[in-house]
Regions:
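Short coil/turn connectors between adjacent alpha-helices in alpha-solenoid helical repeat scaffolds
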Residues: 2-5, 37-50, 81-97, 142-155, ...
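Flexible helix-coil transition and linker loops at the boundaries of alpha-helical arrays
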Residues: 16-25, 58-70, 102-131, 164-176, ...
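Inter-repeat boundary and helix-capping residues of tandem alpha-helical solenoids
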Residues: 6, 24, 28-31, 47-48, ...
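Flexible inter-repeat linkers and adjacent short helices
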Residues: 1-93, 99, 105-114, 121-129, ...
Length: 339
């Protein structure tokens, strides 16, 4: 693919680099560094297309024997392609191809670094972190391709697990948390027979709980809230002989997430969590020891949460989520009317 969606400012910067007296290797490094700048905090999809173009230009400048930097350019293109909003299957397939071409080269150059620091010689050697990041991105791409029936979830999980060999909780807690979150969601998404349903959901719960042994609220609040919210979802729908206990644990997990998520600083995440908590409250008896007494109080609290979530989703243009919440709001109104 030759990128065509490059804005004029980036084209001008590419032209300046091309005409500069820098060496070809220096130009390649400048282009990839610029691309990484666009990828780190993209404001629009255009920033990601710019990153694709810059990596493509870097790849074109690489000589045939400059395999490591060709691989880095390919990995950079893939990272940008997978992050483009509403990305379709064709761009995901291209990202997959780029990563599958880059990974063997990164792994080979990593294998030759025994006794040598990749940080000392970045032009010659890949780092373990580079390889792990490529594995993590491959896992994300494969997971995104599963709904198109173009990849297997087991391959996605395998890629994540390879990345975890480097991204340990001691050194890379944020990546560790994200990888565990993605693995757990992958388990929840696997199409298994009904008798294996509880197994995959149980694996997801275990994966979230394992990550939360190391990801603490005080040190990594954002990742902590993400894991607690998704643990709540897994617990809420976990097939069990004691569903009431699971719902109570799910609500406790949502409450942990809400220690971080609030309507001012993280409105969409907050709305997501309170709507999840409302789902749990909807079916929770007011007095778990006397379920026959009903759950009017909890349904009223659920209604308040749904209403607040709907207002936030609508305000931020999240139409699909708003429609889901409206449907649940109508259901709870109907049930309250019967009480």
């Amino acid at each position: 693919m030759t990128p065509s969606m490059t804005d004029s400012a980036v084209k001008a910067a590419m032209a300046v680099i091309a005409s500069s007296p820098a060496t070809t290797q220096e130009k390649i490094e400048m282009l990839i560094e610029m691309a990484q700048g666009f990828q780190k905090k993209p404001k629009t999809a255009q920033d990601l297309w710019n990153a694709v173009s810059l990596c493509h230009q870097a790849h074109e400048l690489c000589a045939e024997d400059n395999l490591l930097w060709k691989a880095r350019a390919k990995a950079g293109m893939a990272t940008a392609l997978k992050a483009i909003p509403d990305v379709g299957e064709q761009l995901l397939l291209e990202a997959k191809q780029r990563l599958e071409e880059a990974l063997p080269i990164l792994q080979r150059t990593l294998a030759s670094t025994e006794g040598t620091s990749a940080q000392q010689y970045p032009q010659q050697f890949a780092s373990a972190e580079e390889v792990a990041e490529a594995q993590m991105n491959l896992g994300l791409v494969l997971q995104s391709l599963v709904p198109f029936n173009l990849a297997r979830m087991t391959d996605s999980i395998q890629a994540y697990q390879k990345a975890l060999q480097v991204f340990t909780w001691q050194k890379y807690p944020q990546e560790y948390a994200i990888l565990h979150n993605n693995i757990a969601i992958a388990y929840l998404s696997m199409p298994l027979t009904s008798e294996k349903e509880s197994l995959r959901q149980g694996l997801a719960v275990q994966t979230f709980e394992e990550a939360l042994k190391h990801i603490r609220l005080i040190n990594h609040p954002r990742e902590y809230a993400m894991l607690q919210n998704n643990l709540g979802n897994a617990l809420q729908y976990l097939p069990s002989s004691h569903p009431l206990e699971n719902i109570l644990q799910a609500i406790a997990a949502y409450d942990e997430a809400l220690k971080v998520r609030d309507p001012k600083d993280t409105p969409l995440e907050y709305a997501n969590t309170i709507s999840n908590k409302a789902n749990a409250l909807f079916s929770l008896p007011d007095n778990p020891e006397k379920p026959e007494a009903g759950n009017l109080k909890n349904m009223q609290q659920a209604r308040a949460y749904y209403q607040e979530a709907w207002e936030i989703f609508t305000q931020h243009g999240q139409i699909e989520q708003a429609e889901v919440v409206v449907h649940m709001l109508q259901e709870v109104e109907t049930e309250i009317g019967k009480s």
